[in-house]
Amino acid sequence: MKRFPALTLLLALLLVAAPLQNIESAEASNPPRKILTGWLPYYSMKTYLPAVLSNADLIKEIMPFWYTLKFDGKTKKPVIADVYKTANPSVPITEPLTALRNAGMTIIPTITDGTEKLVLANLLAKPVSRKQVVDAIVATVASQNYDGIDLDFEGFAFIDPNTTWKTTAPNWVLFVKELGAALHAQKKILSITTPYLFNPAEKQKGYFVYAWADIAPHIDRLRIMTYDYSTSRPGPIGPIAWTEKTVKYAVSIMPASKVYLGLPGYGKDWVTKVEGVCPANLAKIITPSAKAGTFLMRDAASIAATYGAVPTYNETFAEVTFSYKREYTGTTSSGLSTTCTASRTAWHQNAQSFSVRAQLVAKYQLGGAAQWVIGQEEPLAMVAIREVATSIAPAQLESSLSLSTNQISYGNPVTLSGAITLKDKSPVASLAFSVEGKYPDGTTRILTTGTTSFDGTYSIPMLIGKSVSLRVLTEASWERGASESPALSLVVTRNLILNPPTSVKSGVPFAISGVVLPRAAGVTITLATTTGRVIGTATATDAQGAFTINVPAQARSIATYQITVGADATWPVFASDAFSIIIR
C-alpha cells in the first residue's frame, strides 16, 4: 500500500526537529504550562503527527488512538487489536513513537471498546474474564513500553441499555481497581475517558455507569468528553455552563490534578428544513430526521464563506453558530432530474471557545484539557491555548548539587549540599525535595527527602552503601514546575578495618587481623609488600567479614605491607593503604 508514501521521510525530519524545539522551550524565560493533551488517530498520520509535534511546548501527554478491545469467538477470550498497523502497513509503529518520545511526551495510548452490545459488561462481571481483560491491557502497555493506558469504553453509555448501568457499575469499579493495581505495580498510568457525570444526588445524573467517585482512588487521569451535548437537534457542541458543571462535580470527588476537560476539534451541521425533492442517493441523509454531519473546526470558516453565511459567536454557550442554504441536484429513483434546497445550521468551537475552556483549567487548577483531535483546530485556537497556558505558567526552578567527595569507603558519610532557586536566583524556602539514586543496573530509588532552609539551601549527610549517580528532585505543583539537579556520580569502595601489630619479634610468626565492610563471607584476602611480593598464604573472610592472615617469621626490618581484597560479583578489587610494622 502507498497510503502514506511520504510519512517515513516526514518522521525522519521530525525526529531531528523535536529535540531542537525542546531546547528552545527550555531556554524560554516563561515557557507555557503544559495544559494540553489529546488524541492522535491511526488515520491521516501525515496531518496529525506534525500537528502534535509542532505544539510540544503545550502538550505533556498524547493518547495515540491505536487500539480496540475485541472478543475472539474462537478462543472465547478478549484481545487487543492494533488498528495502527492495519492503517499504516509501511510505517512501523516505532517511528511515530520515537518522534513523540524525542519531543518529551508521555505516551498513553487509548483502547476503545470494539465489542458488541453487553459483551464487555459481561466480561467484567466474571472474575476470570475480567482478569483476562486486565492481562490483555497490561500486555499492550508492555509491548511498546508505554507510560500507561487510556480507556475509552463508550459501549456502556451508547450501546448497552441504560437499564443495565446499575448492574454494570460495580463490576466496572472492580475492573478499574484491579487494572489500576496491576499498572501501578509497574509504575504505569491509568487514564479513563468517559462522557459527563453530574452529582448523583441531583435529578440529572449523566452517565453514572462510570462511577467516578468509586474509581477515583484507582485512576490517575479522568478525561471528560465535554462535547456531543447536542445530537438530534441543532445546538452547541459543549456549552460552557454544562462543561463547568461536570468539571465542578469531578473536582469535588477527586484531586483536580486528575481531571481533564474535553475540547472538540470538530463541529456539527444539522438539516433543519428541506424544500423540493432531494436526489435518491441523498434522500435519507438530507432530511431533518437524519444524523448531523460533522466538519473540522479548521474548515468552518471556509464552509460559511462558501455559502454566504455569517458566523456568530454565542456568549452564553461560548461557541460559534451559522445557518445557510445548500442545493443538491441529482436524479430521483425513477431517473428524473431533481433539486432540493436544505436549510442547515452549524455549531462549532473556535479560538475564543478554546480560550474560555482553557481558563477553566486555570480556575479549577485542572490537570489540563484533552482535545479530539489535535490538528483539527483552526490555527488561532492553538494560539489562544498558548496565551492562557503562558499566563498561568508555573515558576521555573533551578537546583544545584555538590558532594563533599566523589569517592568514599563503605560506612563513611558523604554530604550533599546545594540550593534551589527561581531562575532569577531568588531562594525558595521550605521546599520539599528528594534525593534520587540511579544504580549501574539502571534501577532508581529515592534515598532520602528533605526541605530547603530559609535561604533555599540544603545540606544532608548520608551513608550510601554502593556506587550511585545522585540528583536532587522537586515535584511539580500548580505554582512551580518540577526541577532536577545535574547528576553527580559517587564511587563507594569497600572498607577495610585492620588490626596489625605495631611491632613484632624477628624470627617469630605473627598474625594480622581485620574486617571487610560490607561484611561478606569468602572474600579473598592477600598480604603483599609494596613491591608486590606476596607474603604467606591468601585467606578468606568468615561470615562476619573477619579474617586473619598468618605471616611467616620475618627478618629484622621496618616492613611495609598492603592488603588486597579480592573482587566478587558486586565489588571490584580493593587495596588498603600501605602500613608498616617494626620487626625488631
Each model region followed by its residue ranges:
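Short strand-edge motifs at loop-to-beta-strand transitions and within beta-strands
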Residues: 456-460, 545-549
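Conserved, mostly hydrophobic/aromatic
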Residues: 62, 151, 222, 261, ...
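Substrate-binding surface in catalytic domains of secreted glycosidases
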Residues: 74-91, 157-303
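Short flexible loop/turn segments that cap and initiate beta-strands
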Residues: 422-445, 518-534
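Enriched for extracellular/lumenal, surface-exposed ectodomains of secreted and cell-surface proteins
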Residues: 464-485, 557-575
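Glycan-recognition patch characteristic of GH18 chitinases/ENGases
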Residues: 29-139
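Beta-strand-rich domain onsets/edges
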Residues: 284, 391-424, 489-519
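Glycan-binding loop/region signatures in secreted carbohydrate-active enzymes
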Residues: 265-359, 388-392
